[in-house]
């Protein structure tokens, strides 16, 4: 009987902890208010930095395709449906299949 009463009291206590409490200063309401304030004043803080992402594809015969200077590989494609490739030095695609007729590197530059 004592364990049943203790269990009941523990359950009631836990249920009280789960009941939502309305407070003006919850973290969610504070964050929401700050976001609204920032969005309302975003015209006062124009960005002075503009970046452009320019990309191109470089296709080569064989296993390797290299990007032009200043560009980095963001993806590779290989002939004969080869899906096994790696990027060497951040600028070259290397197709790893045994027989390979072409390789393509997707090269991008942030300027």
Curated annotation (Swiss-Prot):
The keyword Signal applies. Its main location: secreted. It is found in: Secreted. Highly expressed in bone marrow, spleen and white blood cells. Also detected at low levels in thymus, lung, trachea, white adipose tissue, nasal respiratory epithelium, colon, small intestine, kidney, liver, and heart. Disulfide bonds join 55-108, 67-107, 76-93, 78-95, 82-97. InterPro entries: RELM, Resistin-like_sf. GO terms for cellular component: extracellular space. Probable hormone. Promotes chemotaxis in myeloid cells. Belongs to the resistin/FIZZ family. This is Resistin-like gamma. The gene is Retnlg.
